């Protein structure tokens, strides 16, 4: 099954990994933008982005998903059969659901 995955923190990783292990085709990963973290406020990618990069999955990081035409276009091109959302952190508009 073609899947678009929305998630950001480490808690979302088991679900994404399970989808891959079950043989589903991850067409697109959408996660939060990199944010400052730690004492030095170093720009840090969300765990889902790191996982996507390590597995060669296409990944987008919109600041505001409601206002990002690139996300809508990428979803149209990816043609997912289902969207899976696990701890994404933004309200997903009806135009995407």
Predicted regions, residues:
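One-carbon transfer enzymes
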Residues: 1-97
